[in-house]
């Protein structure tokens, strides 16, 4: 997940209301993204799942 280093034309712009980019990974396999997309509030990470969030609405 890249927040501020956008690589055109592959970046994603999140819609209003869900304007944070996020990526979810399993802590056991941190290099394998499970899910990524847009969300309104960054979820808290748990023992098994780690969330990375951008504070912008554009990300790669």
Curated annotation (Swiss-Prot):
Entry keyword Nucleus: no
Signal sequence, start to end: none
Protein family (similarity comment): Belongs to the three-finger toxin family. Short-chain subfamily. Type IA cytotoxin sub-subfamily.
Keyword NAD: no
Recorded GO MF terms: toxin activity
Subunit structure: Monomer in solution; Homodimer and oligomer in the presence of negatively charged lipids forming a pore with a size ranging between 20 and 30 Angstroms.
UniProt note on tissues of expression: Expressed by the venom gland.
SS bonds (residue pairs): 3-21, 14-38, 42-53, 54-59
InterPro entries linked to this entry: Cytotoxin_Cobra, Snake_3FTx, Snake_toxin-like_sf, Snake_toxin_con_site, Toxin_cobra-type
GO biological process: killing of cells of another organism
Protein name per UniProt: Cytotoxin 1
Superkingdom of origin organism: Eukaryota
Pfam families, A to Z: Toxin_cobra-type
Cellular component annotations (GO), alphabetically ordered: extracellular region; membrane; other organism cell membrane
Primary location: secreted
The protein's role, per its UniProt record: Shows cytolytic activity on many different cells by forming pore in lipid membranes. In vivo, increases heart rate or kills the animal by cardiac arrest. In addition, it binds to heparin with high affinity, interacts with Kv channel-interacting protein 1 (KCNIP1) in a calcium-independent manner, and binds to integrin alpha-V/beta-3 (ITGAV/ITGB3) with moderate affinity.
């Amino acid at each position: 997940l890249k927040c501020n280093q956008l690589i055109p034309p592959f970046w994603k712009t999140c819609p209003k209301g869900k304007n944070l980019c996020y990526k979810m990974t399993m802590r056991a396999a941190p290099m394998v993204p499970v899910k990524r997309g847009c969300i309104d509030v960054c979820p808290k990470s748990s023992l098994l799942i780690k969330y990375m969030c951008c504070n912008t609405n554009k990300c790669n």
